[in-house]
């Protein structure tokens, strides 16, 4: 519990109030809660103050656009309403105070970049558990103690949700947490008051331009994690063009590369010298500031070599002995919906992956090719009401790397599926190897029944998701379940 006057440094109210939780959604308010009314992109929380009071809110903090109103207190009945200037910007700091700075008592690692955030955050938590920690994770798949993850709405939750979750993890015994930090979360200051032991940058490719408007804005949002927030250790993928540029500006950052010829300069470093890919993963010979060795990876694809090196480098920077990391790496497992392989005797191999950007799709197809002796199939779609510019680019990638392509439905939302297909098809030079099957289950069925034993079918776009968003309705759908049904 936190007292209202202590939270806002207010002069003593006549009757100070003890608050149980901070709540942004008026529908979730309970007696004793502090309702936070901020102006979001779609709705203004101030419109729901009456609803929050009806549900028993003990106090309200309300965003105001007038600096002169900052920390003034009004009353609705007996309930104090504290006006707060630029509340959304400062909400992370307020929640940090409310929940007693939970990130100070956790080893917190933030992971940002277009692709790889989920795999890296999950691997960090998994590896920390193997090293004897109680780990938690927050991100696209969900939030919770490792092995007890609950589905989440957004990659990076609200400023309040993040602080309250970290507090809950701490009280549940966690001492290590990895969190995916999205560009939206950074641009909207949702992680502003967190204390990061380390931050990892994976890569930057086209995504979310419907929100950021330009790649420059997108990169600037990501960069804040390394230049403006409380981040101790910075681990950067040097093979990414933006990452390489940032390394020239961040002399204390650690450089990680898959290029044996990478010139390390003055940075601490990790680089792969030789990589042997095989059906069960890869064997990575590496050299680093912490020593040399061979890392046995259970993950498929070159991009997962990069992901694993970024994770191991971060743990090495924390002081874990190299020999301990190499020994425990053998027990690591893949991540749900991330290059997840499904195999049955005498059937084509199916790989389910979350790839939903041109770069991610290219990397997934290249990785799938390494395990393909026959034809490579690609099933994909593009989300509705989202960046239309990437749709023809996805088609170009699929046409370049796959022999057979099926365009299908992938969360059309309120947009016409035929319009989405038209945008995608504009990227193909030749439609001979392309089929359009809007029903995703039928698309998967057709591919599995048409492909032969040595073929590989990449089902891209949904990964761990078990739903389709059609109109405003969320319908149960799992690529894995459908694939298994038709493979059996």
Curated annotation (Swiss-Prot):
| UniProt key word Acyltransferase | no
Q: Where is this motif: Meso-diaminopimelate recognition motif?
A: 410-413
Q: Which InterPro entries match?
A: Mur-like_cat_sf, Mur_ligase_C, Mur_ligase_C_dom_sf, Mur_ligase_cen, Mur_ligase_N, MurE/MurF_N, UDP-N-AcMur-Glu-dNH2Pim_ligase
Subcellular localization:
Cytoplasm
Q: Which GO terms describe its molecular function?
A: ATP binding; magnesium ion binding; UDP-N-acetylmuramoylalanyl-D-glutamate-2,6-diaminopimelate ligase activity
For whether the record's keyword set contains Nucleotide-binding, the answer is: yes
Which reactions fall under this protein's catalytic activity?
UDP-N-acetyl-alpha-D-muramoyl-L-alanyl-D-glutamate + meso-2,6-diaminopimelate + ATP = UDP-N-acetyl-alpha-D-muramoyl-L-alanyl-gamma-D-glutamyl-meso-2,6-diaminopimelate + ADP + phosphate + H(+)
PTM summary from the entry reads: Carboxylation is probably crucial for Mg(2+) binding and, consequently, for the gamma-phosphate positioning of ATP.
Which top EC class is named for this enzyme in its record?
Answer: ligase
- Record-annotated residues binding ATP? 113-119
List the Pfam families hit by this protein, alphabetically. Answer: Mur_ligase (PF01225), Mur_ligase_C (PF02875), Mur_ligase_M (PF08245)
Q: Which UniProt keywords apply?
A: ATP-binding, Cell cycle, Cell division, Cell shape, Cell wall biogenesis/degradation, Cytoplasm, Ligase, Magnesium, Nucleotide-binding, Peptidoglycan synthesis
Q: Which residues carry this modification: N6-carboxylysine?
A: 222
**Amino-acid positions noted as binding UDP-N-acetyl-alpha-D-muramoyl-L-alanyl-D-glutamate in the UniProt annotation, renumbered to this chain:** 24, 26, 41-43, 154-156, 182, 188, 190
- What GO terms describe the biological role, i.e. biological process, of this protein? cell division; cell wall organization; peptidoglycan biosynthetic process; regulation of cell shape
- Cofactor dependence: Mg(2+)
Q: Which residues form a coiled coil?
A: none
Pathway where this protein functions: Cell wall biogenesis; peptidoglycan biosynthesis
What are the record's GO terms for cellular component? cytoplasm
PANTHER family, per the entry: MUR LIGASE FAMILY MEMBER, UDP-N-ACETYLMURAMOYL-L-ALANYL-D-GLUTAMATE--2,6-DIAMINOPIMELATE LIGASE MURE HOMOLOG, CHLOROPLASTIC
Q: Which family does it belong to?
A: Belongs to the MurCDEF family. MurE subfamily.
What's its job? Catalyzes the addition of meso-diaminopimelic acid to the nucleotide precursor UDP-N-acetylmuramoyl-L-alanyl-D-glutamate (UMAG) in the biosynthesis of bacterial cell-wall peptidoglycan.
Protein's recorded name: UDP-N-acetylmuramoyl-L-alanyl-D-glutamate--2,6-diaminopimelate ligase
